[in-house]
Amino acid sequence: MSQGTIVKVSGPLVIAEGMRDANMFDVVRVSEHRLIGEIIEMHGDRASIQVYEETAGLGPGEPVVSTGAPLSVELGPGLIENIFDGIQRPLVKMREMVGSNITRGIDVTALDRSKKWDFQPTVKKGDKVTAGDVIGKVQETSIVEHRIMVPYGVQGTIEEIKSGSFTVEETVAKVRTENNELVDICMMQKWPVRIGRPYREKLPPNAPLVTGQRVIDTLFPLAKGGVAAVPGPFGSGKTVVQHQLAKWADADIVVYIGCGERGNEMTDVLKEFPELKDPKTGESLMKRTVLIANTSDMPVAAREASIYTGMTIAEYFRDMGYSVALMADSTSRWAEALREMSGRLEEMPGEEGYPAYLGSRLAQFYERAGRVVCLGSDGREGALTAIGAVSPPGGDLSEPVTQATLRIIKVFWGLDSSLAYRRHFPAINWLQSYSLYLDIIGKWISENISRDWETLRSDTMRILQEEAELEEIVRLVGVDALSPSDRLTLEAAKSIREDYLHQNAFHEVDTYTSLNKQYRMLKLILGFYYSGKKALEAGVSIKELFELPVREKIGRAKYTPEDQVNSHFNEIEKELNEQIEALIAKEVQ
């Protein structure tokens, strides 16, 4: 343990002398208050420390003690349904200790040391095990089975394994290694947050992460193990999009990081999630969620840690063979924390004052996502999908954080303030956004939902692009100057926008749409467009076409409950065909 003394305090940055034996990224305890900090720069025996708690009142001469270990998180039963701060201190436990206002210098363990968990072994004495092998299971919540794994670097034969109720620190198994050492295994592991957890092999994504949000699943889908960014100006709905994805994405585990955003937004999550039911299991959404709250009024340095803490917890569940979705809201606040610390370290600034290493830090974060073959002899697969919100000032997508993010991610959902002001939510601009997973996911949907999905999707995008071109003409000469065919295109685009892409996050049916219902809705809206073209060719007037009674039913189709989709949509399709045929027959006479 290395001990030094403070020589300078500058906001969250503390400089200490006499730290020659300390190492980069060691956790230190600063002053008599024992504040948690991390060494981020070394010059001889001088260490620059970013402190994760309030530094007011600190002064030169106070002691700094290095623990000799990097910033690590505790991984084991008790993570699910919990809410932590950026350095994995449980906020519920802290509230019990000091009340609602967090005071500094609190030392509390992340996992409850007194709670007993029912451990059921899945291996027996004499079995050979290697790092990553599942040796037992704990039913953590009614829907999450926590798999206890052999820690990294341990390999050998099971010498002893127990069954029953244990705390996370009690030994549940003993492994005799090849060097004849006896290693105790408990239900808890520790892992340094800045180092990605190892896996055997990285695989390309092969299936969609179904979110239930029509504009995402249909036009700009995200794959399990993929990376996406949601940039947008203030008030365009980034947080609601993130909440919707956290609620309805078909992942087994959701890790939600509130990094430098408003405290009220985390309150919304805490209030809504326990009341909402998971469409797959019918259980509360909190039973599969881990929350990390690092709101804008908490110390800046802890924002950087919160992103890594969340990613490490997500990787741990991925290693069990689960599909995990990680939401980071917002990576811009994290980048601002990097900029502040870089400025205090007097480093050479890059573009707009951000440090020159901004791009590499963002890449380190996003590259930890992916679909992998986990460590262990059973060859199980896990997937970690990362979705980061970006808050560019004034909605300027050319600023450094957005540009650095765009170089890394494969799905871009660009939020548009003009759509938000028109009350069109989710305000994802269909002309700016893109997804590079279309080929993989199109193939999966063609095999599992319908073969004409890709045709419907490409026709939808074509109609929306044609609408953007026609809008310019309409502004100049008015809609009446257009040909009937162009007017039909405009009407179809309006129907796609208002009846399909627009989705009410607060309506109990419309908030989530299954892939089958999305396919039926799109087929119905485009069915009107295709039939309308035939009717126009047969001489039907555009006015008669627009006044068809079935059009109101098409507009209300999104409110059809999931269990009535096939019967209700078959009826509407039948009505549409009958009414179009009646118009054509009338013209022929």
Curated annotation (Swiss-Prot):
Signal in keyword set: no
Positions annotated to bind ATP: 232-239
Sorted UniProt keywords: ATP synthesis, ATP-binding, Hydrogen ion transport, Ion transport, Nucleotide-binding, Translocase, Transport
A Pfam cross-reference name: ATP-synt_ab_Xtn
Gene3D superfamilies associated with the record: 2.40.30.20, 2.40.50.100, Bovine Mitochondrial F1-atpase, Atp Synthase Beta Chain, Chain D, domain 3 (1.10.1140.10), P-loop containing nucleotide triphosphate hydrolases (3.40.50.300)
GO CC annotation: proton-transporting ATP synthase complex
GO terms of molecular function: ATP binding; proton-transporting ATP synthase activity, rotational mechanism; proton-transporting ATPase activity, rotational mechanism
Known catalytic reactions: ATP + H2O + 4 H(+)(in) = ADP + phosphate + 5 H(+)(out)
Disulfide bonds: none
EC number, UniProt record: 7.1.2.2
Top-level enzyme category: translocase
Cited PANTHER family: H(+)-TRANSPORTING TWO-SECTOR ATPASE, V-TYPE PROTON ATPASE CATALYTIC SUBUNIT A
Record family assignment: Belongs to the ATPase alpha/beta chains family.
Role noted for this protein: Produces ATP from ADP in the presence of a proton gradient across the membrane. The V-type alpha chain is a catalytic subunit.
Record's protein name: V-type ATP synthase alpha chain
Organism whose genome encodes this protein: Acetivibrio thermocellus (strain ATCC 27405 / DSM 1237 / JCM 9322 / NBRC 103400 / NCIMB 10682 / NRRL B-4536 / VPI 7372) (Clostridium thermocellum)
